[in-house]
């Protein structure tokens, strides 16, 4: 993986990116494992919180067609750093926002950052998972990461909510994003696998 600096052992490089992919998949603007506590703590209706989840999913779906154009324009380090910063900021401010349109917008942006980070990690370790680009191998691994992270996210949310407070899940994810940013700063360098591709005409 040429984006890593020389001192990072080759054997652990893919595992680092797999870890980063899991951290992005654990994230969300709000966490439905603490749904009832959020309804009481933020004085919102159940439908309001569910709309946050829909906004998060919409952010991932709408941004998905742009992922390859972004990959061809920016370096892996730039994309992962910006995605981690976006998730970090969204998780820090989401618990303190009760104005619903703004909260939905924050969750929408968080979804865009989430899919950006996950895509960058998984696309770079695809050949490590299956050197022949066999999608019958790659997609089961991808589903394990995505679906496993969804279940793990609810478990962590429930644990933190029971012992501390429902907002601690947001702080936990913010802490993971700080770790991701440190990895990107220390272990990763800017690397282009092809010439810079302009964003002109991205809507086509």
Where do the protein language model's features map onto the residues?
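Short hydrophobic/small-residue motifs within alpha-helical transmembrane segments
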Residues: 56-58, 147-148
């Amino acid at each position: 993986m040429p984006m890593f600096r020389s001192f990072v052992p080759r054997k652990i490089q893919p595992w680092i990116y797999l870890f980063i992919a899991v951290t992005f998949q654990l994230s969300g603007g709000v966490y439905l494992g603490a749904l009832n506590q959020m309804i009481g703590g933020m004085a919102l209706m159940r439908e309001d919180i569910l709309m946050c989840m829909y906004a998060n999913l919409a952010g991932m779906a709408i941004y998905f067609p742009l992922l390859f154009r972004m990959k061809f324009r920016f370096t892996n380090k730039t994309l992962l750093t910006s995605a981690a910063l976006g998730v970090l900021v969204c998780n820090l401010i989401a618990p303190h926002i009760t104005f619903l349109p703004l909260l939905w917008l924050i969750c929408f942006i968080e979804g865009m950052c989430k899919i950006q980070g996950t895509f960058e990690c998984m696309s770079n370790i695809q050949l490590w998972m299956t050197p022949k680009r066999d999608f019958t191998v790659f997609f089961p691994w991808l589903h394990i990461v995505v679906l496993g992270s969804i279940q793990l996210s609810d478990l962590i949310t429930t644990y933190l909510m029971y012992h501390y407070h429902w907002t601690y899940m947001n702080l936990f994810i913010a802490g993971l994003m700080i770790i991701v940013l440190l990895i990107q700063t220390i272990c990763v360098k800017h690397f282009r696998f092809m010439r810079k591709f302009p964003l002109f005409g991205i809507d086509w």
